[in-house]
Regions:
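Rossmann-like dinucleotide-binding domain for NAD(H)/NADP(H)
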Residues: 222, 229-324
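Rossmann-like adenosine-cofactor binding region
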Residues: 171-269
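Glycine-rich NAD(P)-binding loop of Rossmann-like domains
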Residues: 119-153, 321
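Alpha-helix C-terminal capping/helix-to-coil transition sites in glycosyltransferase folds
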Residues: 41-42, 65, 192-193, 218-221, ...
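Phosphate/diphosphate ligand-binding glycine-rich loop within oxidoreductases
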Residues: 44-123, 131
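N-terminal glycine-/charge-rich "phosphate-binding" loop or analogous flexible N-terminal tail
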Residues: 1-48
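Conserved beta-strand positions in the Rossmann-like core of class I SAM-dependent methyltransferases
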Residues: 166
C-alpha cells in the first residue's frame, strides 16, 4: 500500500474522498480514524476538522515529516499548537465560509433591525398593531470589524441596500468597497460611526475581549451589533449589561461563549434569552446544502498548493493564537 503523505482528521464521508480524488489524485492519504500509525511516517500534511473529536490519540510530534496543517474551518482558536512540532505551519480555511456567513450576517441584521421575532409573535397572536419599531439598512452606515474575506462578503451583500461601509483592519489600509478604513487600534473611533456594527474578526490574543463596556458605550444608543466572528472578542457580561440598560440598542449573535459541540449544548452565564433586544442563532451561519462541498474544495486547493511546492495561502503566525 502507498505510504500516506496526507492525514485526514475528519469524519469519513464520500464528499471528502471525491474532492481529494479530484484535486490530489497522486497523493496517498488516509483517515485518522481508519488509518494505522505505522503508515504515517511519511505524512507531510494534515487536513484538520474538529480539534476535540478528530485529534484524539494522534501524536503529531511522532510524525517526523509533518510540516503543514490545513484546517477545514476558518478559525484557529482552540488548536492545541503545543501538540505539534515548532516546524509545523498552520492555515485556516479563510474565505471558505465567507459567502454563507455573510448571508447569515445580513439576515441577522435584518431580523434585529426589523424586530422580526416580535413581529412574528404579533402575527401569531392575530394582531396587526402596534407594529414593532423598525430600523433600516437602506442608506445607513455599517461598520465591519475585520475586513477580510467575510467582511468583504458582507460589504458586497450590503451594496444593494446602498449602505455606507466603514471597515476596520489591522493596518487601516484602504480596501475596495469601503468609504473609510480604521486601523485595529482605533476600534472605538470606528464603532462610533455605525448604525450597524458587524464583528467578523478571528479570536486572537489581540482581539480577545476587545469589545468591552467602553467600546459598547461608544456605539450609538440605537446601534445594531451583529457578531458572526467569535464570541470571545466580546466580553459576555459587558454585552449583557449593555443590552439590559440600553433597550434601544440591539444585538444579533450567531456565536456564543459556552459552546459544547461534543454534547450539542449551548450554555449561558447570563439570561440572554430573556432580553427583548437580542436575536440569536445557534452558531449555524456555516450550514446549507452547498456549504460542505465548497468548504472542502477551498481547503484542499490550499493543500494542493503545498504538495506542488508552492506557498500555501493564509498561513498564520502561531504566536497570535498561542497562550503565553
Amino acid at each position: 500500500m502507498t505510504e500516506s503523505r496526507l492525514l485526514v482528521a475528519l469524519r469519513p464521508r464520500e464528499e471528502i474522498r471525491s474532492v481529494l480524488g479530484r484535486q490530489l489524485p497522486t497523493i496517498g492519504w488516509e483517515y485518522v480514524s481508519e488509518g494505522s500509525p505505522s503508515r504515517w511516517k511519511d505524512v507531510e500534511a494534515m487536513l484538520l476538522g474538529s480539534v476535540e473529536r478528530e485529534l484524539v490519540g494522534v501524536n503529531a510530534r511522532a510524525l517526523p515529516h509533518l510540516r503543514f496543517v490545513q484546517r477545514v474551518y476558518t478559525g484557529m482558536d482552540g488548536v492545541p499548537f503545543e501538540r505539534f512540532p515548532d516546524r509545523v505551519r498552520f492555515a485556516g480555511n479563510v474565505g471558505g465560509y465567507a459567502p454563507f456567513v455573510a448571508e447569515h450576517a445580513v439576515a441577522l441584521a435584518l431580523a434585529a433591525a426589523r424586530e422580526l421575532p416580535r413581529a412574528h409573535a404579533l402575527a401569531a397572536a392575530g394582531k396587526l398593531r402596534p407594529p414593532p419599531v423598525q430600523r433600516l439598512l437602506w442608506k445607513r452606515t455599517a461598520v465591519i470589524l475585520g475586513y477580510g474575506e467575510i467582511g468583504r462578503a458582507i460589504a458586497a451583500r450590503l451594496a444593494g441596500f446602498e449602505t455606507r461601509i466603514v471597515g476596520l483592519n489591522r493596518t487601516g489600509r484602504a480596501a475596495p468597497g469601503c468609504s473609510e478604513m480604521f486601523a485595529a487600534d482605533r476600534l472605538i473611533d470606528a464603532v462610533k460611526e455605525g448604525d450597524f456594527v458587524f464583528d467578523a474578526r478571528p479570536l486572537t490574543r489581540a482581539t480577545e475581549g476587545s469589545i468591552d463596556a467602553s467600546v459598547l458605550s461608544a456605539m450609538k444608543t440605537t446601534a445594531v451589533f451583529i457578531n458572526v466572528g467569535r464570541a470571545g472578542t466580546v466580553r459576555e457580561e459587558a454585552l449583557y449589561q449593555h443590552l439590559s440598560s440600553h433597550p434601544d440598542f440591539r444585538a444579533a449573535l450567531d456565536v456564543w461563549w459556552h459552546e459544547d459541540f461534543a454534547s450539542g449544548r449551548l450554555e449561558h452565564q447570563f439570561p440572554f434569552a430573556d432580553l427583548p433586544n437580542l436575536v440569536g442563532t445557534p452558531h449555524s451561519a456555516g450550514f446549507g446544502p452547498d456549504v460542505e462541498q465548497y468548504v472542502l474544495e477551498r481547503a484542499v486547493a490550499n493543500l494542493a498548493r503545498f504538495f506542488a511546492g508552492e506557498e500555501p495561502r493564509y498561513v498564520i503566525q502561531r504566536s497570535e493564537y498561542e497562550r503565553p
